[in-house]
Amino acid sequence: MTRKRIMLMGLLIVPVSMYLVSIAISGVVNFRTLENLGFPDFDSDSLVFRNEKNIVWSPDSSKGKIIVLSFFFSSCPTICPAMNFHLKEAHDRLYGFKDLTFISCTVDPDTDTPAVLNKYKENLGVGNSNKWQFITGDSEDLYKLANSYYLTALKDSDSPGGYAHSQSAVLIDWEGNLRSRITDEGNILGAYDLSEAFLIDQLVDDVRVLVKEHRKVKLGQK
């Protein structure tokens, strides 16, 4: 290889390397978008809940924000502690993004009153966070919300703790549409498994994709 060719390769490699490093540092993902799976079939006006501060919350009240939606219950003896521990990691990594909110809904509203959820939030270490709300309300409406986004939520005497729910979260964009990555195999991922720490990277990466898309939309650059 000639000296001239080596110099040319160096001129190409250095800028590309610096660009990739800047992406890694900034957390910006530029190479893809997420599949739009559409708006769920429910009347969002009819679904009204309360958060851990006993403030009214509905899906419409988070319009304009990217939502990370999940379901749990405070007395869950199995997967919930790990789910919310891993969600906290995602929350902490994404805290700097303005138009983002985490919504965790109980499947046991009889037990999980606003006061109980507020204590749960404090114990999780996010008591002062304005980006994470813990939601309670009528069980039928909570289960309807879950099912509308293809998540499981129901009372089930055969399940540990008496309730069954998905161990995954879904991503909802600022217009209420369900969004998801396409896997390397060409399948729609749909929901983001919260049971293992290493799987949280998928969720964090895809939130960053939506954040970038949302910024472009707000700037009129669709």
Located regions from the model:
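N-terminal targeting signals for export/organelle localization
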Residues: 1-48, 213, 217-222
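Surface-exposed short loop/turn segments
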Residues: 148-158
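Hydrophobic alpha-helical segments, especially N-terminal targeting/anchoring helices
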Residues: 50-51, 172
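Structural microenvironment flanking redox-active thiols in thiol-disulfide oxidoreductases
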Residues: 83-145
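Short active-site neighborhood of thiol/selenol oxidoreductases, capturing the structured segment around
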Residues: 57-87, 102-103
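Short loop/turn microsegments at loop-to-beta-strand junctions
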Residues: 44-45, 66-67, 166-167
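Thiol-/selenol-based redox modules, centered on thioredoxin-like
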Residues: 157-222
